[in-house]
């Protein structure tokens, strides 16, 4: 039983950090040095490595003294001095005024079985003192009645001396409270209390005795606390440190002391913050604020109730008030609505000192130095004088404007991955070009080309070519600048700190020798540059051309548009496609897909050609690099600046998302053959053309990667995963590791955005837990795929977890017959995934989702499956009693049938108020146990994130003692233990409203199911829906028309197959008369078959029509030959074989008759097929839900 050790309070306090803080040295943030001005200016720095428990020991005695001063403030016998000293490790704190009552404590004497006096109880007995039960108007800094005892328990020895005007009490306390000597009590008229002690330094991580450095460092900290206390108690009481009075008896003096060296001669703004109701109005707060550009972040010193308060709602209240004024003034000054100042910006140049008392506060944090009080106390009762805020705001705004000025134009940085041209910056600088490579692989290609040497003597080399890496990404400079109009009307463009510190862009500026103050309109100005031009060498994919190159152009257009006008910005246009004809080693090269498409249409066949795509520069081999660099000059194209470019740069890279959204609602207009020929003939590319084609294509592609299509509710990545899954698991649905399946998708579906993001998407597609995005998982996850606890972020590594296709569900939701009718994406000339699916049910409104993209927000809340089924069936079935009503609603764009949020896997409540639904968690209140048990959270709220949000809310944690989470992945059980007497106060403070009761408000057990129904359209661009009904109404015709297309295509295929099989049967019957074996070749045999009326057919197309359209079937199927007859083997001419063919024809004819019948169905062709497929999907969903989507 040795493991079940029993420890008393004293021993526990010696060993555990929970009482006074860490018991060893740690780095403590927020420790600031102070400065004192004697004859010479003297700085007292404070190092950050200290033992919190030791500082707590000293602080407890100081706070006890200031508490006593406040308690005696309005009494006859006041505290006139507090003497603090520290010498050779011995700390002492003394104050006059009434001493501790020297009377016996009956209860303690009875327990100890000896005479115990009140001073001993106050200093040696844990959980005893005057601060345990505090009144609401109490302004004491003490909290739990353990502070002085902690000082004793961490002291080698201590001497307590107190005099109450009649007697003097002296008591020695040794060995960390283990040896308490009897007190000496003598008559005395004095009135004071003094405590001296020697901490156990060695136990707390210090030398014992203290080293000189430690002694000086601790002395500086204690001096700081003495100065703080001097400001707190004011001029009526003198604070001494080592017998020297502290001169900081006001908040102004304290602020000056802190900033004497760091911000000398700064204006100090002071004010008094008053309250309008008792008890707060009895204790105004004194505030001093120092505003200086030398401060780089907001800092504050708060001495509240004598405690050095590290944070609290009073500071937040002041910061928000300052920020509100600064934002207003800043907007009036800069006159730029797109320029936003944050709370951090507004307060980063301020040092604030707050001194005073606040009644009824709680002290939290391990060292009990974090102020906690309901935030609405300040909003309701306290007010900050407007004159103070106004005068201070003017200074803050002036500093903000200065900080974003152009004084930092020539900041020098270390430029990574830069190779200088030998002639750069010299007499031949204008003949040099800087090659800006997209990344490391592009740098390797350039280096290979520039070092060809003798094999390419007339080609480019390092003599006139430098190289620099763009690092694979460029910052959007357009969003990092602010235009400020001065009083004189001049517009100044200022860069923010992020832009000036950006290594890539600043590296380009430094390497080229660019000056932000120069416009480069004249040749004389341009001649000062270190290079004659910059050549962008980027991949031919959307990321390279559309994003990186576009951002580089935008950067130059923003600061130096004249350089583009004079041809300074160029690009290396490398071949996108090479076509090798069989037997010919010289390829045909194409730089745009439109060129290749036009060429391909003119070819009779590409069977003898090999087509290779080069979207990445790294795809070119050594031979191809040599070939390119022999004609390097011909591959360098110059950008030109046309009239419409300025507006397009603003649209695609500026801060006005509404302009960009309007532009991106339409698709890209591809380059025409005439345009590509024009570009090649002059080797010039208008910026507007690049932006309208490449940049817009990238933006639209980014949207499709982040926002789903309304037809299938899928982003491009998820669509690739589904298409890859249907292909990969088609023949064998055995489980595969996530990373293996990810590799398959990347290879077969041409995924180009990294393994990590792909594997993450696969894992999400298999997640199924309460609150997950997908109510209908695409894959069955085998292993740990994440839980509700962390919102799925706790999934296992892709190397260890596996997936298999949820085939029973997927194959019913996405019928195989649809796959031949859908439009497909072509990557590198090969068919990849469909541009969109059209599932049997509207998946876009059946699952959850949220994502932003290019100014749009996408947020959906899954709708009730039963409502969706009812609506879709009513739309299809003309015998449904609600059929006509629904069609009337669709025609008139109204709603008649419910389409409620899904409550599947959710044990809470859904309620509607106005136009929005709200989800509510559930809870059980136990007044007897003073506890609330949360049994369900609002929809899609992860457990850990929820608990963290509660803990971050100080006004809620003021009532909470402990939060314990016993939740599983399926169920919620969160125990919220309240502090004593908190329940009634919670109900009083967190008011009940129509939408939520007090407990729901307090525990944040409600969220709004607000939707942003922005989806990608089938042909690209965004469509904005106003309701889930609109999505459903838009989706229905696409699914409906698919049945007619499917049936018409099936009819065409059946007819062709019947024609072919009938011809074969006829040939078998007439083969003896035709006797084709007597003819010498197939051509002659074909002539005979033609003369006898046998149709020439394209057997391969009829047998495997796959992606052929009806038009292609009708045109090409009857333009074949007679291989289907001439390839028949002898056994296929037997009577048994003929009989089987006749039966096959009958079955096909029967199916054709059925198809013809389905095409004549009402209200539309294939209506009954759709109903059957809906039944199959519903059955699969029910089975999936009943088996946790394992289907077994």
UniProtKB/Swiss-Prot annotation:
One of its GO terms (molecular function) is DNA topoisomerase type II (double strand cut, ATP-hydrolyzing) activity. It comes from the Viruses. Pfam families: DNA_topoisoIV, TOPRIM_C. It catalyses: ATP-dependent breakage, passage and rejoining of double-stranded DNA. Its EC number is 5.6.2.2. Residues 707-1174 form the Topo IIA-type catalytic domain. Its cofactor is Mg(2+); Mn(2+); Ca(2+). GO terms for cellular component: host cell cytoplasm. Induction: Expressed in the early phase of the viral replicative cycle. The lineage of its organism: Viruses, Varidnaviria, Bamfordvirae, Nucleocytoviricota, Pokkesviricetes. Mg(2+) 1 binds at residues 438, 539. It comes from African swine fever virus (isolate Pig/Kenya/KEN-50/1950) (ASFV). Gene3D superfamilies: 3.30.1360.40, 3.30.1490.30, 3.30.230.10, 3.40.50.670, Histidine kinase-like ATPase, C-terminal domain, Topoisomerase II, domain 5, Topoisomerase, domain 3. ATP binds at residues 64, 95, 142-149. InterPro entries: DNA_Topoisomerase_II (IPR050634), HATPase_C_sf (IPR036890), Ribosomal_Su5_D2-typ_SF (IPR020568), Ribsml_uS5_D2-typ_fold_subgr (IPR014721), Topo_IIA (IPR001241), Topo_IIA-like_dom_sf (IPR013760), Topo_IIA_A/C_ab (IPR013758), Topo_IIA_A_a_sf (IPR013757). The active site is at residue 800. Binds two Mg(2+) per subunit. The magnesium ions form salt bridges with both the protein and the DNA. Can also accept other divalent metal cations, such as Mn(2+) or Ca(2+). This is DNA topoisomerase 2.
């Amino acid at each position: 039983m040795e493991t079940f050790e029993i420890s008393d309070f004293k021993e526990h306090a010696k060993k555990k950090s929970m009482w006074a803080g860490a018991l060893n040295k740690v780095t403590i943030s927020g420790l600031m040095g102070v400065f004192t001005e004697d004859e010479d200016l003297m700085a007292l720095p404070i190092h950050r490595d200290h033992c919190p428990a030791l500082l707590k020991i000293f602080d407890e005695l100081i706070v006890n003294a200031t508490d006593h001063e406040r308690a005696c403030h309005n009494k006859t016998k006041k505290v006139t001095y507090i003497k603090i000293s520290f010498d050779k490790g011995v700390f002492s704190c003394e104050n006059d005024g009434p001493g501790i009552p020297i009377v016996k404590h009956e209860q303690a004497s009875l327990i100890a079985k000896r005479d115990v006096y009140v001073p001993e109880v106050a200093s040696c007995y844990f959980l005893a003192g005057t601060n345990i039960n505090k009144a609401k108007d109490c302004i004491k800094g003490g909290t739990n009645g353990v502070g002085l005892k902690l000082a004793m328990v961490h002291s080698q020895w201590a001497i307590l001396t107190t005099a109450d005007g009649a007697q003097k009490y002296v008591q020695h306390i040794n060995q960390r409270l283990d040896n308490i000597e009897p007190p000496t009590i003598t008559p005395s008229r004095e009135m004071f209390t003094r405590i001296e002690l020697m901490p156990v330094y060695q136990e707390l991580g210090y030398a014992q005795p203290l080293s000189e450095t430690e002694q000086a460092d601790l002395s500086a900290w204690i001096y700081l606390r003495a100065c703080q206390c001097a400001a707190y108690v004011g001029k009526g009481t003198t604070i001494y440190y080592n017998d020297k009075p502290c001169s900081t008896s006001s908040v102004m003096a304290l602020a000056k002391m802190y900033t004497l060296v760091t911000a000398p001669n700064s204006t100090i703004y002071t004010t008094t913050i008053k309250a309008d109701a008792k008890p707060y109005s009895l204790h105004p707060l004194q505030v001093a604020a120092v505003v200086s550009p030398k401060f780089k972040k907001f800092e504050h010193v708060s001495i509240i109730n004598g405690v050095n308060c590290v944070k609290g709602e009073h500071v937040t209240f002041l910061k928000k008030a300052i920020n509100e004024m600064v934002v207003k003034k800043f907007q009036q000054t800069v006159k730029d609505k797109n320029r936003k100042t944050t709370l951090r910006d507004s307060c980063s140049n301020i040092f604030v000192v707050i001194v005073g008392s606040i009644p009824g506060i709680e002290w939290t944090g391990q060292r009990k130095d974090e102020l906690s009080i309901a935030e609405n106390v300040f909003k309701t009762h306290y007010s900050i004088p407007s004159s103070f805020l106004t005068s201070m705001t003017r200074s803050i705004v002036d500093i903000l404007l200065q900080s974003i000025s152009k004084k930092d134009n020539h900041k020098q940085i270390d430029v990574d991955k830069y190779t200088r041209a030998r002639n750069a910056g010299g007499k031949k600088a204008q003949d040099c070009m800087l090659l800006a490579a997209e990344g490391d692989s592009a740098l390797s290609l350039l280096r290979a080309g520039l070092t060809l040497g003798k094999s390419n003597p007339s080609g480019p080399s390092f003599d006139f070519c430098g190289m620099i890496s763009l690092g694979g990404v460029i910052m959007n400079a357009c969003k990092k600048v602010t235009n400020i109009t001065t009083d004189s009307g001049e517009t100044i463009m200022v860069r923010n700190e992020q832009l000036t510190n950006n290594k890539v862009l600043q590296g380009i500026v430094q390497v080229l020798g660019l000056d932000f103050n120069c416009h480069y309109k004249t040749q004389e100005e341009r001649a000062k540059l270190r290079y004659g031009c910059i050549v962008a060498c980027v991949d031919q994919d959307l990321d390279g051309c559309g994003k990186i190159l576009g951002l580089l152009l935008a950067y130059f257009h923003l600061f130096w548009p004249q350089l583009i006008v004079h041809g300074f910005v160029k690009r290396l246009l490398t071949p996108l496609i090479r076509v090798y004809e069989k037997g010919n080693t010289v390829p045909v090269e194409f730089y745009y897909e439109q060129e290749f498409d036009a060429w391909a249409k003119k070819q009779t066949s590409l069977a003898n050609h090999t087509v290779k795509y080069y979207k990445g520069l790294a795809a070119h081999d050594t031979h191809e690099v040599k070939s390119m660099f022999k004609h390097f000059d011909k591959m360098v194209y110059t950008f030109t600046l046309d009239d419409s470019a300025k507006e397009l740069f603003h649209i695609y890279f500026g801060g006005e998302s509404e302009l960009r959204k309007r532009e991106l609602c339409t698709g890209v207009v591809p380059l025409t053959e005439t345009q590509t020929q024009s570009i090649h003939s002059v080797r010039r590319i208008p910026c507007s053309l690049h932006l309208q084609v490449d940049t817009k294509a990238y933006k639209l592609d980014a949207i499709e990667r982040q926002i789903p299509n309304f037809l299938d509710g899928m982003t491009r990545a998820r669509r690739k995963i589904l298409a890859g899954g249907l292909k990969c698991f088609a023949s064998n649905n055995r489980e595969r590791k996530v990373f293996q399946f990810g590799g398959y998708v990347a290879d077969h579906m041409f995924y180009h955005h990294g393994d990590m993001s792909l594997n993450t998407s696969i894992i999400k597609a298999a997640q199924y837990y309460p609150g997950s995005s997908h109510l209908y998982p695409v894959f069955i996850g085998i292993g740990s795929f994440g839980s509700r606890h962390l919102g799925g972020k706790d999934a296992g590594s892709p190397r260890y977890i596996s997936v298999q296709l949820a085939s029973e569900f997927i194959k019913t939701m996405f019928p195989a017959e649809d796959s031949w009718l859908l439009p497909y994406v072509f990557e590198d000339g090969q068919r990849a995934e469909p541009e969109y699916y059209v599932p049997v049910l509207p998946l876009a409104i059946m699952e959850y989702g949220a994502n932003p993209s290019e100014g749009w927000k996408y947020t959906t809340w899954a709708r009730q499956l039963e409502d969706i089924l009812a609506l879709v069936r009513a739309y299809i079935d003309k015998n449904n009693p609600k059929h006509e009503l629904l069609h009337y609603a669709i025609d008139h764009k109204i709603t008649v049938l419910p389409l409620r949020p899904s409550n599947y896997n959710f044990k809470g409540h859904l309620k509607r108020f106005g136009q929005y639904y709200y989800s509510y968690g559930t809870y059980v209140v136990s007044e007897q146990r003073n506890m609330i048990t949360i049994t369900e959270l609002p929809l899609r709220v992860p457990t850990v994130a929820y608990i963290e949000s509660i803990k971050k809310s100080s006004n809620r944690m003021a009532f909470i003692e402990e939060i314990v989470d016993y939740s599983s992945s399926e169920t919620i059980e969160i125990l919220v233990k309240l502090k004593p007497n908190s329940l009634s106060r919670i109900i009083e403070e967190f008011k009940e409203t129509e939408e939520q009761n007090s407990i729901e408000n307090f525990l944040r057990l409600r969220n709004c199911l607000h939707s942003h129904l922005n989806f990608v359209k089938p042909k690209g661009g965004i469509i904005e829906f106003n309701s889930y009904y609109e999505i459903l109404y838009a989706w229905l015709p696409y699914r409906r028309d698919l049945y007619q297309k499917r049936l018409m295509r099936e009819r065409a295929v059946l007819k062709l197959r019947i024609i072919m099989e009938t011809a074969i049967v006829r040939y078998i019957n007439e083969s003896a008369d035709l006797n084709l074996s007597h003819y010498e070749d197939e051509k002659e045999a074909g002539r005979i078959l033609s003369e006898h009326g046998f149709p020439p057919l394209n057997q391969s197309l009829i047998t495997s029509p796959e992606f052929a359209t009806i038009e292609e079937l009708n045109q090409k199927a009857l333009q074949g030959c007679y291989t289907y007859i001439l390839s028949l083997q002898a056994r296929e001419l037997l009577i048994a074989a003929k009989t089987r063919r006749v039966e096959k024809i009958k079955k096909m004819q029967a199916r054709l008759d059925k198809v013809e019948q389905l095409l004549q169905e009402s209200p539309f062709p294939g209506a009954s097929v759709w109903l059957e497929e809906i039944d199959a999907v519903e059955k699969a969903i029910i089975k999936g839900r009943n088996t946790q989507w394992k289907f077994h």
